[in-house]
């Protein structure tokens, strides 16, 4: 699930911002995706991604009627979830690094409860902060604390079991009159059903909802692609590398693209 109010026209480097979030899910082996956005953007998303058949995936689309918080995405997606574990991804969160995919696969081995990622950051007060006790057990999770007790924050990629639906159902709105994702995590924590997976040092996280971080992400992606000689955030290439589409199908997709730098880079690698 990609749940965030992100316009389809928002781009980083030479492709839509949503490509990066979707690329991470593809590399993690996710084949069914529900896009949740504003009603006005749904037709744009459909035009951009279609049914998913071209990538041997399945895409569905729906919208959030009213902005009442991130956990509302779980309410909206009840039928899609269908009593199965799922991923809730915020489309404006970018993760770049070699070890990221292997970490995602470890997280997906968790079948009961919830799992979150943790990343060390210079500005922890911008996000939910994790505090451990001496035994490395989670002591607390506090949303945007004024005086953070650690530099470990939770980025926007969450893993839940089917019980998250009842958890969200029992949530009460915060002072902002919204449902808070940190309350979902605290509910699992109280039951000792929340696991944390720390990202390795090679993984960079960017919250591109911040204009400055979007610029930083763009520059970092440029350097990363140049150094690794790989195309980062390519849903077509990632689907091919997963074995979901053939080289012939990949080339057909490339030929159907309008002329762009992205098409040139993808053609060179295919």
Predicted regions and their residues:
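Single conserved hydrophobic/aromatic residue that forms the stacking wall/gate
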Residues: 1-7, 12
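A structural signal for short hydrophobic beta-strand segments in well-ordered beta-sheet cores
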Residues: 130-132
